[in-house]
Amino acid sequence: LDQWRELNKSPRWSAFHFYDQGREIAERCVRAPDTMRAIRLLPQPDVALRSPTAMFSVLQPKTRIPPHTGVANFRLVVHLPLVMPPHCGFRVGGETREWRIGEAWVFDDTIEHEAINDSDELRVVLIFDLWNPHLAPEEREMVRAMTAAARAYTG
């Protein structure tokens, strides 16, 4: 999509994935054992080839991630700021909040959201998935089964 043109194959926005679309990247997980220990204590979705996702998201100075949406609300996304200089912003829907180090923002990423680093310094956020707490265990299993069936059908 044209909205991503400036960031495609650009070091201006990068991610260090621990989990990527449901696949653990073991050699990266061992590099952040405390982070992984904490994430593994949380109710993460386990939907084959979809979730969980966990990463350090790095946004270079004077860089904007354009408005975008996720594709599934069976999960919520957590943004936990780790390195947050002044003049960084994050918007979900019509709500913009001030970042506070150590305070997570949990949201449904099917709602349009964007991030801005208007500072002269690097911004780092830990991003990871959680099961949507409104889903009962039976509904979670239906999400897994439906996703697996769709993957089998589409190849």
Residue ranges with predicted function:
Residues 1-69, 74, 85-88, 135-155:
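Fe(II)/2-oxoglutarate oxygenase catalytic core
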Residues 51, 75-77, 85-87, 110-112, ...:
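Active-site lining segments that contact anionic ligands and/or coordinate catalytic metals
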Residues 65-68, 89-91, 107, 113-119:
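Short beta-strand His + acidic residue motifs that chelate non-heme Fe in jelly-roll/DSBH
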Residues 77-81, 106, 121-136:
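A short hydrophobic beta-strand segment most commonly corresponding to one strand
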